[in-house]
Amino acid sequence: MAKKEKPEKIICQNKTARINYFIEDTYEAGIVLAGTEVKALRDGKGNLKDSYVAVKDEEIYLYGMHIGPYSHGNISNHEPERVRKLLMHKREIRRLYGKSREKGFTLIPLKVYFNNSRIKVEIGVGRGKKLYDKREDIKLKEDRRAMERGLRSRSREG
């Protein structure tokens, strides 16, 4: 009998990333965590706001991710904002390093999720949006909502 695939359980998302950046490409990476960090993430205490990814000495690190303290932890609980190492193949790291060196591109963590009981980080290669791009996106979103509202009201009448 085939093994059932479990849907990935999202722990936390960086919602501002898609607002502030055009995401060109995404990659999946593992993450090195302490035991209390894993338990805290299972409780949903992760936050990706203001976090970023950087390549240093042919290794890739996640900066600024906040993982709240584990509620049942003791004195040896983890540090909430420490630098965490990400796990990827060397060729993927080199590719990301090359893209991050290009003008305007940055590496942004998009979400943290469970994949078969392992914690993974989705990294996006993005280019920053200008203010007028953000306004254009907001206008398109409002137009789409207005159209859906109009269709809903029309279907209720008839």
From Swiss-Prot:
UniProt GO BP: trans-translation
Main location: cytoplasm
Keyword Cytoplasm included in the entry's annotation: yes
Function, as annotated: Required for rescue of stalled ribosomes mediated by trans-translation. Binds to transfer-messenger RNA (tmRNA), required for stable association of tmRNA with ribosomes. tmRNA and SmpB together mimic tRNA shape, replacing the anticodon stem-loop with SmpB. tmRNA is encoded by the ssrA gene; the 2 termini fold to resemble tRNA(Ala) and it encodes a 'tag peptide', a short internal open reading frame. During trans-translation Ala-aminoacylated tmRNA acts like a tRNA, entering the A-site of stalled ribosomes, displacing the stalled mRNA.
PANTHER family: SSRA-BINDING PROTEIN, TMRNA-BINDING COMPONENT OF TRANS-TRANSLATION TAGGING COMPLEX
HAMAP family referenced in this protein's UniProt entry, alphabetically: SmpB
Name of this chain's protein: SsrA-binding protein
Gene that this sequence comes from: smpB
